[in-house]
């Protein structure tokens, strides 16, 4: 007898360890687990820990050649989800040795790569991860971060303004550049390639880059402000992506852009390193995120994708608007906005933050609010997101009845009015509409915008009751 007992044994005998004291170096995960009928939660939780670390479906002879206690994931705590039948939050601790340094790709392949198709589970969602400082320190993180970006742009004390150029597909490069110029001239800080603008037959990437750069330099000369356009470098191969970023750098632009989920974490991390080495800011779009994060009980919550982006690298990331959505979503959106910007985030279950997360000086990421917002939302956005954010008005700029430049003027005037009012100690939540109305007396462009998008009622009371 060699001490090897073949056969299948329950996962919970090895991987469910409720007495385990987590280590400071462990990666901790919170999963929302819905077991199949008849599968006890301990077995389901242990199965998740096993299949995402050292386990397989049967005992194997080679288990004896390693120290499983050192390398196995452990399910160390299970709590039922209030108000849900047969749903549990399962906490799993992974030893740091299971992960390659500086690789978001490897971290995800290990933690979520295999276990989601597991038969014993009906559905599974990764709600949060605690990344230990020992692992955070193996990542470069965002190319520059919030403070360096402000210094590069010479813009302080207010949110930054952006606009996605529409129609997103079909414009020629020259007309696209015209639209960029009008927006920047009117007072925006940035314009943006749509996420699916890459290099299509009607507008090849190189032509677009050249005409957009012409627009940037012309607008800078006229306004005396630094301007940028998020040149989307996303491409079919990593080499082509870097080639586009290199060309952007040669043109002297301040910022490029990447779709980090469709482009992939490996490509994104490479681009992020290139951007830091070459002084480019990196704007990140989250195209495809809803495929992964939309279902409440299956997939990966966006806060995990946001943490992963901060590790992989990006200076801006789209993070929803909060305005007009349900209150619970508001708190949760604020939760991952804080995770993106701050250096140390306390556990706060009301915001969906399952673990205290120290970032040990990893640069922060600016959250980008974009999607269906216009001048009447400005007070709410200023109040909710604060100065360190990018507010992006696509239709809210280009839909102005007088054209792009007046649309940009309207947004800039509204923003400056809100920032001034806030600095004077006024209550943006209560007086928001009044502030915008008053400012529109001095700005015909803003008055016209206010007329088009008529006052909206802010669902804004809940902010104070967090």
Curated annotation (Swiss-Prot):
Entry-annotated residues carrying N6,N6,N6-trimethyllysine: 5
Top class in the EC scheme: lyase
Compartments, as annotated in UniProt: Plastid, Chloroplast
Species this chain originates from: Drosera regia
Residues that, per the record, bind Mg(2+): 192, 194-195
UniProt-recorded name of the protein: Ribulose bisphosphate carboxylase large chain
Any Gene Ontology CC annotation: chloroplast
Chief location of this protein within or outside the cell: plastid
Family statement drawn from the similarity comment of this UniProt entry: Belongs to the RuBisCO large chain family. Type I subfamily.
Gene that encodes it: rbcL
